[in-house]
Amino acid sequence: MFIGIVSLFPEMFRAITDYGVTGRAVKKGLLNIQSWSPRDFAHDRHRTVDDRPYGGGPGMLMMVQPLRDAIHAAKAAAGEGAKVIYLSPQGRKLDQAGVSELATNQKLILVCGRYEGVDERVIQTEIDEEWSIGDYVLSGGELPAMTLIDSVARFIPGVLGHEASAIEDSFADGLLDCPHYTRPEVLEGMEVPPVLLSGNHAEIRRWRLKQSLGRTWLRRPELLENLALTEEQARLLAEFKTEHAQQQHKHDGMA
Protein backbone atom coordinates (compact mmCIF):
# COMPACT_ATOMS: atom_id res chain seq x y z
CA MET A 1 0.00 0.00 0.00
CA PHE A 2 1.25 3.47 -0.91
CA ILE A 3 0.62 6.42 1.41
CA GLY A 4 1.87 9.85 0.44
CA ILE A 5 2.07 12.59 3.06
CA VAL A 6 1.98 16.32 2.38
CA SER A 7 3.15 18.03 5.56
CA LEU A 8 5.28 20.90 6.81
CA PHE A 9 6.67 18.48 9.42
CA PRO A 10 7.41 15.18 7.67
CA GLU A 11 9.86 14.28 10.45
CA MET A 12 6.91 13.63 12.75
CA PHE A 13 6.04 10.54 10.73
CA ARG A 14 9.12 8.69 11.92
CA ALA A 15 6.86 7.58 14.76
CA ILE A 16 4.94 5.65 12.11
CA THR A 17 7.75 4.54 9.80
CA ASP A 18 10.28 3.50 12.45
CA TYR A 19 8.26 1.92 15.25
CA GLY A 20 5.62 -0.66 16.07
CA VAL A 21 3.29 -2.47 13.70
CA THR A 22 3.54 0.18 11.00
CA GLY A 23 7.32 0.29 11.25
CA ARG A 24 7.47 -3.47 10.68
CA ALA A 25 5.10 -3.10 7.73
CA VAL A 26 7.42 -0.51 6.19
CA LYS A 27 10.47 -2.72 6.72
CA LYS A 28 8.67 -5.68 5.12
CA GLY A 29 7.74 -3.60 2.11
CA LEU A 30 4.02 -3.96 2.80
CA LEU A 31 3.61 -0.23 3.38
CA ASN A 32 5.34 2.45 1.32
CA ILE A 33 5.22 5.87 3.02
CA GLN A 34 6.67 8.91 1.27
CA SER A 35 6.42 12.58 2.21
CA TRP A 36 6.49 15.98 0.54
CA SER A 37 6.89 19.31 2.32
CA PRO A 38 5.33 22.43 0.79
CA ARG A 39 8.47 24.30 1.92
CA ASP A 40 10.42 22.46 -0.76
CA PHE A 41 8.10 23.98 -3.37
CA ALA A 42 8.24 27.59 -2.13
CA HIS A 43 9.71 30.04 -4.65
CA ASP A 44 11.16 32.70 -2.34
CA ARG A 45 14.42 32.50 -0.43
CA HIS A 46 12.56 32.42 2.91
CA ARG A 47 10.62 29.32 1.81
CA THR A 48 7.36 31.02 2.78
CA VAL A 49 4.37 28.70 3.08
CA ASP A 50 1.75 30.88 4.80
CA ASP A 51 -0.22 33.98 3.85
CA ARG A 52 -2.85 36.31 5.30
CA PRO A 53 -6.53 35.43 4.76
CA TYR A 54 -8.75 37.72 2.71
CA GLY A 55 -11.30 39.49 4.91
CA GLY A 56 -8.90 39.75 7.82
CA GLY A 57 -9.09 37.84 11.06
CA PRO A 58 -6.53 36.10 13.25
CA GLY A 59 -3.99 33.62 12.01
CA MET A 60 -2.61 32.68 8.63
CA LEU A 61 -3.51 30.18 5.92
CA MET A 62 -1.25 27.77 4.08
CA MET A 63 -0.14 29.42 0.84
CA VAL A 64 -1.80 27.96 -2.25
CA GLN A 65 1.12 27.52 -4.64
CA PRO A 66 3.56 25.52 -2.47
CA LEU A 67 0.74 23.33 -1.15
CA ARG A 68 -0.71 22.57 -4.59
CA ASP A 69 2.72 21.83 -6.02
CA ALA A 70 3.46 19.42 -3.16
CA ILE A 71 0.13 17.66 -3.73
CA HIS A 72 0.85 17.41 -7.47
CA ALA A 73 4.27 15.89 -6.74
CA ALA A 74 2.68 13.32 -4.44
CA LYS A 75 0.07 12.49 -7.09
CA ALA A 76 2.77 12.04 -9.72
CA ALA A 77 4.68 9.63 -7.47
CA ALA A 78 1.55 7.68 -6.57
CA GLY A 79 0.34 7.28 -10.14
CA GLU A 80 -3.24 6.75 -11.25
CA GLY A 81 -5.95 5.97 -8.74
CA ALA A 82 -4.64 7.75 -5.65
CA LYS A 83 -7.27 9.16 -3.31
CA VAL A 84 -6.34 12.55 -1.81
CA ILE A 85 -7.53 13.12 1.75
CA TYR A 86 -7.44 16.33 3.76
CA LEU A 87 -7.41 15.88 7.54
CA SER A 88 -9.93 18.42 8.77
CA PRO A 89 -12.34 19.01 11.69
CA GLN A 90 -15.02 19.53 9.03
CA GLY A 91 -14.51 16.05 7.59
CA ARG A 92 -16.33 12.78 8.06
CA LYS A 93 -15.55 11.37 11.48
CA LEU A 94 -13.23 8.37 11.31
CA ASP A 95 -14.62 5.14 12.73
CA GLN A 96 -13.91 1.46 12.15
CA ALA A 97 -16.30 1.28 9.20
CA GLY A 98 -14.51 4.24 7.64
CA VAL A 99 -11.11 2.67 8.29
CA SER A 100 -12.24 -0.53 6.59
CA GLU A 101 -13.49 1.52 3.65
CA LEU A 102 -10.25 3.48 3.32
CA ALA A 103 -8.21 0.28 3.54
CA THR A 104 -9.66 -0.85 0.20
CA ASN A 105 -7.59 1.87 -1.49
CA GLN A 106 -4.09 0.87 -2.54
CA LYS A 107 -2.97 4.51 -2.82
CA LEU A 108 -3.73 7.33 -0.39
CA ILE A 109 -2.34 10.84 -0.20
CA LEU A 110 -2.85 12.58 3.15
CA VAL A 111 -2.73 16.38 3.24
CA CYS A 112 -1.94 17.83 6.66
CA GLY A 113 -3.08 21.38 7.27
CA ARG A 114 -1.42 23.91 9.57
CA TYR A 115 -2.13 27.44 10.80
CA GLU A 116 -5.84 28.26 10.31
CA GLY A 117 -6.23 25.81 7.45
CA VAL A 118 -5.99 25.95 3.67
CA ASP A 119 -7.56 27.95 0.87
CA GLU A 120 -11.03 26.54 0.09
CA ARG A 121 -10.18 26.39 -3.60
CA VAL A 122 -7.41 23.89 -2.88
CA ILE A 123 -9.99 21.66 -1.21
CA GLN A 124 -12.35 22.05 -4.17
CA THR A 125 -9.74 21.24 -6.81
CA GLU A 126 -7.27 18.85 -5.17
CA ILE A 127 -9.05 16.99 -2.36
CA ASP A 128 -11.25 13.92 -2.86
CA GLU A 129 -12.40 13.48 0.74
CA GLU A 130 -12.09 15.20 4.12
CA TRP A 131 -11.74 13.11 7.29
CA SER A 132 -11.69 14.03 10.99
CA ILE A 133 -10.65 12.04 14.05
CA GLY A 134 -12.96 13.92 16.42
CA ASP A 135 -14.72 17.09 17.42
CA TYR A 136 -11.72 18.94 18.80
CA VAL A 137 -8.96 21.17 17.46
CA LEU A 138 -5.32 20.16 16.98
CA SER A 139 -2.34 22.22 15.86
CA GLY A 140 -2.16 20.41 12.54
CA GLY A 141 -3.18 17.38 10.53
CA GLU A 142 -0.12 15.27 11.29
CA LEU A 143 -1.47 13.45 14.34
CA PRO A 144 -4.81 12.67 12.64
CA ALA A 145 -2.87 11.43 9.61
CA MET A 146 -0.79 9.12 11.82
CA THR A 147 -3.97 7.83 13.44
CA LEU A 148 -5.45 7.08 10.04
CA ILE A 149 -2.28 5.36 8.81
CA ASP A 150 -1.99 3.17 11.90
CA SER A 151 -5.62 2.07 11.75
CA VAL A 152 -5.65 1.44 7.99
CA ALA A 153 -2.34 -0.46 8.03
CA ARG A 154 -3.85 -3.11 10.30
CA PHE A 155 -5.97 -4.26 7.35
CA ILE A 156 -3.00 -4.88 5.05
CA PRO A 157 -2.44 -8.65 4.74
CA GLY A 158 0.71 -9.71 6.56
CA VAL A 159 1.01 -6.60 8.75
CA LEU A 160 -0.37 -8.12 11.94
CA GLY A 161 1.22 -11.14 13.56
CA HIS A 162 -2.16 -12.86 13.70
CA GLU A 163 -4.55 -12.28 10.82
CA ALA A 164 -7.57 -12.60 13.12
CA SER A 165 -6.43 -9.64 15.20
CA ALA A 166 -7.95 -7.00 12.92
CA ILE A 167 -11.21 -8.95 12.72
CA GLU A 168 -11.45 -9.22 16.50
CA ASP A 169 -10.48 -5.61 17.27
CA SER A 170 -12.91 -3.31 19.04
CA PHE A 171 -15.52 -1.94 16.62
CA ALA A 172 -14.68 -4.53 13.94
CA ASP A 173 -18.17 -6.00 14.40
CA GLY A 174 -19.71 -2.81 15.75
CA LEU A 175 -18.98 -3.74 19.37
CA LEU A 176 -16.33 -2.90 21.93
CA ASP A 177 -13.76 -5.58 22.63
CA CYS A 178 -14.13 -8.02 25.50
CA PRO A 179 -11.77 -8.02 28.53
CA HIS A 180 -8.45 -9.84 28.10
CA TYR A 181 -6.20 -11.56 30.65
CA THR A 182 -2.69 -13.00 30.78
CA ARG A 183 -0.45 -14.38 33.55
CA PRO A 184 -0.47 -14.44 36.54
CA GLU A 185 -3.70 -16.33 37.09
CA VAL A 186 -4.29 -14.42 40.34
CA LEU A 187 -3.25 -10.77 40.70
CA GLU A 188 -3.71 -9.15 44.11
CA GLY A 189 -6.70 -11.37 44.79
CA MET A 190 -8.28 -10.82 41.37
CA GLU A 191 -8.67 -14.08 39.46
CA VAL A 192 -8.88 -14.75 35.75
CA PRO A 193 -12.48 -15.78 34.86
CA PRO A 194 -12.58 -19.59 35.17
CA VAL A 195 -14.14 -20.06 31.73
CA LEU A 196 -10.94 -18.78 30.11
CA LEU A 197 -8.99 -21.55 31.82
CA SER A 198 -11.49 -24.27 30.94
CA GLY A 199 -10.27 -25.09 27.44
CA ASN A 200 -13.89 -25.16 26.27
CA HIS A 201 -13.65 -23.05 23.13
CA ALA A 202 -17.40 -22.82 22.61
CA GLU A 203 -17.94 -21.48 26.13
CA ILE A 204 -14.98 -19.12 25.79
CA ARG A 205 -16.43 -17.71 22.56
CA ARG A 206 -19.82 -17.30 24.22
CA TRP A 207 -18.28 -15.55 27.27
CA ARG A 208 -16.26 -13.18 25.11
CA LEU A 209 -19.30 -12.27 23.01
CA LYS A 210 -21.37 -11.67 26.14
CA GLN A 211 -18.69 -9.44 27.65
CA SER A 212 -18.28 -7.56 24.38
CA LEU A 213 -22.02 -6.90 24.20
CA GLY A 214 -22.18 -5.94 27.86
CA ARG A 215 -19.20 -3.60 27.72
CA THR A 216 -20.72 -1.87 24.69
CA TRP A 217 -24.05 -1.50 26.52
CA LEU A 218 -22.32 -0.02 29.57
CA ARG A 219 -19.85 2.29 27.84
CA ARG A 220 -21.15 3.03 24.33
CA PRO A 221 -24.86 2.17 24.27
CA GLU A 222 -25.41 4.24 21.12
CA LEU A 223 -23.44 1.66 19.14
CA LEU A 224 -26.09 -0.95 19.86
CA GLU A 225 -28.78 1.23 18.32
CA ASN A 226 -27.32 0.67 14.87
CA LEU A 227 -26.93 -3.10 15.20
CA ALA A 228 -29.42 -5.82 14.36
CA LEU A 229 -28.57 -8.31 17.09
CA THR A 230 -28.82 -12.01 16.36
CA GLU A 231 -30.95 -14.19 18.60
CA GLU A 232 -27.83 -15.37 20.41
CA GLN A 233 -26.52 -11.83 20.87
CA ALA A 234 -29.85 -10.60 22.24
CA ARG A 235 -29.96 -13.51 24.69
CA LEU A 236 -26.39 -12.97 25.86
CA LEU A 237 -26.96 -9.25 26.32
CA ALA A 238 -30.06 -9.96 28.40
CA GLU A 239 -28.02 -12.37 30.54
CA PHE A 240 -25.32 -9.74 31.00
CA LYS A 241 -27.85 -7.12 32.07
CA THR A 242 -29.36 -9.50 34.62
CA GLU A 243 -25.95 -10.44 36.01
CA HIS A 244 -24.89 -6.79 36.11
CA ALA A 245 -28.04 -5.81 38.02
CA GLN A 246 -27.43 -8.60 40.53
CA GLN A 247 -23.84 -7.45 41.05
CA GLN A 248 -24.96 -3.86 41.53
CA HIS A 249 -27.61 -4.93 44.04
CA LYS A 250 -25.02 -6.99 45.93
CA HIS A 251 -22.56 -4.08 45.90
CA ASP A 252 -25.21 -1.63 47.12
CA GLY A 253 -26.12 -4.02 49.92
CA MET A 254 -22.51 -4.12 51.11
CA ALA A 255 -22.09 -0.34 51.00
Curated annotation (Swiss-Prot):
GO terms for biological process: tRNA N1-guanine methylation. Its EC number is 2.1.1.228. It comes from the Bacteria. Coiled coil: none annotated. It catalyses: guanosine(37) in tRNA + S-adenosyl-L-methionine = N(1)-methylguanosine(37) in tRNA + S-adenosyl-L-homocysteine + H(+). It holds the Pfam family tRNA_m1G_MT. InterPro entries: Alpha/beta_knot_MTases, tRNA_m1G_MeTrfase_C_sf, tRNA_m1G_MeTrfase_TrmD, tRNA_m1G_MTases_N, tRNA_MeTrfase_TRMD/TRM10. CDD domains: TrmD-like. Specifically methylates guanosine-37 in various tRNAs. This is tRNA (guanine-N(1)-)-methyltransferase.
